[in-house]
Amino acid sequence: MIKFNGLDRIYDAYSWRITHRAKQVWKTGNVVGNRHVEGSYVDQFETSVAKYTKRKYAVAVGSGTDALYFALRAKGIGPESTVACPAISYLATAEAIKRTGATIHFVDVDNKGLISKLPGFGLPDAVVYVNLFGNLADYSILKEFCIKRRIPLIEDAAQSFGSFYNLEQRRC
């Protein structure tokens, strides 16, 4: 039988690290800390992610759905808004948009499941760009389109975290 994916190989390679870290967290009980205790594992995680992605900040949230929701709300997306997102994605993408009260415009994708252009339905208030199956596309055209029109472009990197594009400094 040919497996759809070989996650067992990845687990075998990293399981000792995962188990070791989990034991440390369970032993200390200091997962999120509190306002009087600094240096929790969440703080360490946020610092590491910010450094890895070359961003000033990173904020850990409960799920990727929450991350998308908070990003949309931070850009002012709400009940009167329209948001474009790929027609092929995980349910969380549409769910996060729907939670804001915005109208979703599903956009066709290319053969890798990535948005390559926006259709002529009018300008959306935001675009959620989803990297599927670990693929990163050259989204420079979409980015340029959004920048020129001051449309927020939110990248959903849940399936591509840690990926590089053309070995450049752009990390998800």
Where are these predicted regions, by residue range?
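Short, intrinsically disordered, charge-balanced linker/junction segments flanking boundaries
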Residues: 24-25, 30, 116, 169-172
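Structured catalytic cores of enzymes that bind and process phosphorylated ligands/cofactors
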Residues: 6, 154, 160, 170-172
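Generic, ordered loop/turn and secondary-structure boundary motif
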Residues: 3-8, 32, 89-92, 162, ...
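PLP-dependent aminotransferase-like
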Residues: 73-164
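Conserved PLP-binding active-site segment in aminotransferase class I/II-type PLP enzymes
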Residues: 1-78, 100, 129
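Residues in and immediately flanking transmembrane alpha helices
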Residues: 19, 144, 168-169
